[in-house]
Amino acid sequence: MSMRFIVGRAGTGKSTLCRQEIHKESQEHPEGLPLILLVPEQATHQMEMSLAHDPQSGGILRAQVLSFRRLGWRVFSEVGGGGKAVIGEVGKRMLLRRLLLNHRSDLRVFARSATRPGMADLLAQAIAEFKIYRITPDQLRGIEDADELLLQKTHELAFLYEELNKSLGTAARDPDDELNLVAGKISQAPFLQGAKIWVDGFKGFTPQELYVIQAMLGTAAEITVSLPLDPELLKAGTPRFKPGEELFYEPRQTYQGLVDLAREAKASISHVFLTETHRFEKAGLKHLERFYNAYPTQTFPGGDDSTAPDPLGIALFPAANKRAEVEGVARELRRLAREEGRTWRDCSVVTRDLPGYQGIIEQVFNAHEIPYFLDHKRPVIHHPLLELLLSAIETVQKDWAYEPLFRCLKTDFFPCSKDRIDRLENYCLAYGIHGSAWKGNRSWSYYPDPNHKEETAGLNETRQIIYDLFSPFDQAIRPHPEAGGPSVTVAQITEAIYELLIRLKVPEHLQEWAEAAHSRGDLAEAQLQNQIWDAVIQVLDELVAGLGEEVMDLSDFAMILTSGLENLQLGLIPPGYDQVLVGSLDRSRNPETAVLFLLGANDGILPGKPSDEGVFDELERLRLESKGIMLAPKGKVQVYEEQYFIYTALTRAREQLYISYPLTDEEGRGLTVSPVIHRLKMIFPGLPEKYLSLDEEEPGALPHPYALLPAYALHLQKLRQGSSLSPLWQAIRLWFLSQTAAFPQVQLLEKGLRDQNEEGKLPQPLARQLYGKRLVTSVSRLELFARCPFAHFAQYGLKLKERSNYRLSPPDMGQFFHAVLHDYAIALRERGLDWGELSKEQSWQLVNETAEPIALQLQNKILLSNARYRYLTHKLKRTVHHAVRVLGEHARQGVFLPMELEVKFGPQEALPPLEVPLSGGNSLLLRGQIDRIDGAVLGHEIYLRIFDYKSREAHVSLNQIYHGLDLQLLAYLDAALQGAQILVSSSGLAEGSKGSEGSEGSEDSEDSTIHPAGFLYFPVLEPQLKSKTLLYPEQLEKDRIKAVKVKGYLLADRQVLLAMDRDLENSSLLGIKLTKSGEFKKGSPILTEEQFALLRKHLQHFLRCSGEALLEGDISITPYRQGKHTACQFCSYKPLCHFDPYLPENNYRNLPVIQDEEFWQRVQSQDSEQYPEQHPPTSVPGETSRRALQKDGGNSPRGQELIWLGEDEAGAGKEDDGHE
């Protein structure tokens, strides 16, 4: 029984000596007792490979490479004790999550954070630390004379620690307890009796691991432990470390602990001191290892190879940023492979900040076609299988809600194509299908159009497949306490999950994905797909082992399972032999390598900052230590540990060490270099540096062609913008053009150089086929065309539209307002009532009567779908009620009467269309729907006023009219005036007029002249008032009515305006202001009749110009811009047009702001031939039009179903399908 120490600094051959001794033993005694090489878990694969490929070892017939965990398995397999189910790290976190939920009321310190994400992780780490350092719950409870917070913490941790052990019971075991169990059974393990054991690759051991070593001392013939330690420290026997020696702090402490164990066991102790370094082939690397931590500084004096091209073997790579840094490393790796014949496995890349570099390394190395292996555990929370588990449970929990259900369906495990799932999703979104609508055998038939029967049948087939697969899972885990059904246990839920996975053939899918990854050369992905099934099943097994018989609701189960799956990580072994190893500096074992790249040498990263995470802070750990509770070292010891990590990284390379660091972060802010760089420059004055940037021009620095493609695209863009290519890039371009078969992306990039992001014109025959010889269009279409011709083409030519969604949008609310106001007016007319006659209570009652049936028809009864929408319905009714109160005030103050409601004009409609002749015998016909036309007879004159309801504040200006951005009111007025005789005849206006002061009703409307009285936007809004004083209800009502302002233009005729508001001088309804002399104030929204005529002429001019442009095929990407407003602000087609104002061919149409005076000057200066006079018909057309008006103009109740009528808020009356 003996313990032997192999002690030496980095590169002195400790691991080599261990392998040589194992080789010698196996050669001398081929059939002797086992030769065990005990190494860190991460190094087992690497050491097995080393032994297997060592030509002297003869393989590993006697030798066994074990980690402490594998050693435990071997012991249990020989002597028993390993039959219990193992609850791993994931399982413990799930158990702790459950304990926190169950005992939250018993906790004080941890109560508030019990449900906080990550709390179970912190507690699991704390309890694991207690077990590893062999601290019992009783020891925690026994702490006295500490502050109250620390005492409460330790008592609560002791409670949770004990409850966790109880949860594990006798049926399961915690891996953190295994080494204690292993130590107790080692004496019974035959394979360890008389065995020789080498322990290599450790700088320190936990108390549990020391316990195992102590147990092996009693059975093994000899234990050899290699330690990375300067032999001079042991020879000197110094009790304290000198400056620079702190990096050996942990190995020195470990050595002392092992010596104490050996002496206690009365084992003999011997030493092998290795003082000569054998690893380093460059004098600089050898000097660096010996003197990096030596004080005073030992400057490199040169050496035997000082005349060689690179006597140091060390180079610094400052870089512009992280991407430039990794790009430079990738180029150097390819150069080493190309020029020096290096294999990929000769090179390693390490960093202290692997998460910060991982994504960039993956992108850049893939682009350079550098095979690499990322040595870290992969989190798999975003894997489709885990998403399936969590979304399936959430789907049942939320009763088949849309969002979790379609997350579940999009995992690709259901036997439905992506296209079928997408179509199903669109359908469900459009009609608000969720919950009970999925269940049962009732088919869906929400499409109102019978032409969709075939598509509906396909959707129902897909729904049935999903329901048949998913409903057994729903029924199995859904508790039914109201029906007296049994509660559901964790085991039952888990069994149902497993059965769902089998029904969906998840293992087969994963196997297919693994094979596909393997076939495309992604071996790491193939490994992951092969491992994920077993990992998930292990999590479910651990859940059952720990909580199987516990009754649990789905929300708690989902929370616990989520906490477990979030911590699920998979460790992969290198899938290929010749790969660049990419790893983190703090791994337990970083292997020796020929060439090493150390990335991220910045302050705060190298060395890393000591971690303050955990249940206990540094001060609390010191207090616990004073009470005899020894935990993992923190603070100062972590600083020593960081120095050791740096030492390890600097001494891994045999031939070449590259150290790189970015000078700026992603936002261009400067970064400070690491103290390591300053130290290196002190030791090696004149250390070579090479600055890395993304704009390299030296041919020797060119990367792999695939990695050049982004830079190639950038240079082509510069070429397109007028710059010239350097000779190097001219040569690169010629080479790429000769290799288009190997690089198909080049053709696309070159095409982009020639292509312009612009659309010309459709061929005229195609435009006429698309829009028709008689171009039937609407105001909203022409306004869109004025904003951007391409947007008009996308919406009305290509007929693109956004996905329908089952929600109440602003257009839906506008539709509701229009419908209620229409039916309210019809109800008044049928009851012989006037708008101004009803009291507030009576109008509210009538609004309710008219709104209820409309709410049933809107968006598949969306207003009745839940409590929120039912409340919103009440608010919408209040808004409409306020609108009718304001309209009632208009009626009380004036003599204008509603003539017709929702009057359609267009081909085959009540009123004729606005028709404009175009060139080539073509014509434009404008159609639409006018919300409300009011009329008044003043003397022998008839005046018409247009109202258009808006569910928002709307304004109209001459500037907008001039540019065609807002033509709605003007077009409606023009249509009403053209069909005025039809309106007057059908409405009986002349006979039913209230008259006005000084006027009488006309006896013969045929002899009356019809004039425009104005056009107005009426906002259907419920204003919110602010007042510093308390208002009585009557005053509040008046103020709220005054707050609703109509916007538009009115006729500049005092008699006409008095007919609208008899209190004109103090008008709150029209926004008209008068001077003391009774004149109109400047800025009042009034126009003369001649100006209304000019507006109508301008409309005709605009319609003609727009019609000609449409039929000429104008689909140009030319959005307007005026001030801060552009056509692109709320455009849905930006992903389609790719408009980019920075491209030379993409420019806004900058529209000047036209002031009112300039507007009239421009309109009046136009050639009169451009404005053909258009007179209203002098005689009433035939009875067909009159009957059509009586049928469609608003005299009958609304039909059975509401149909959204487009951008005009029920403006067009039917779909804008282009041509007649």
Curated annotation (Swiss-Prot):
Residues 1-281 form the UvrD-like helicase ATP-binding domain. Its EC number is 3.1.-.-. ATP binds at residues 8-15. GO terms for biological process: double-strand break repair via homologous recombination. Its cofactor is Mg(2+); [4Fe-4S] cluster. Residues 1162-1171 have a biased composition (Polar residues). The keyword Oxidoreductase does not apply. Gene3D superfamilies: P-loop containing nucleotide triphosphate hydrolases (3.40.50.300). Residues 283-590 form the UvrD-like helicase C-terminal domain. It comes from the Bacteria. GO terms for molecular function: 4 iron, 4 sulfur cluster binding; 5'-3' exonuclease activity; ATP binding; double-stranded DNA binding; helicase activity; metal ion binding. Residues 1211-1220 have a biased composition (Basic and acidic residues). PROSITE patterns: UVRD_HELICASE_ATP_BIND, UVRD_HELICASE_CTER. [4Fe-4S] cluster binds at residues 788, 1128, 1131, 1137. Heterodimer of AddA and AddB. HAMAP family: AddB_type1. The heterodimer acts as both an ATP-dependent DNA helicase and an ATP-dependent, dual-direction single-stranded exonuclease. Recognizes the chi site generating a DNA molecule suitable for the initiation of homologous recombination. The AddB subunit has 5' -> 3' nuclease activity but not helicase activity. Belongs to the helicase family. AddB/RexB type 1 subfamily. Despite having conserved helicase domains, this subunit does not have helicase activity. This is ATP-dependent helicase/deoxyribonuclease subunit B. It comes from Desulfitobacterium hafniense (strain Y51).
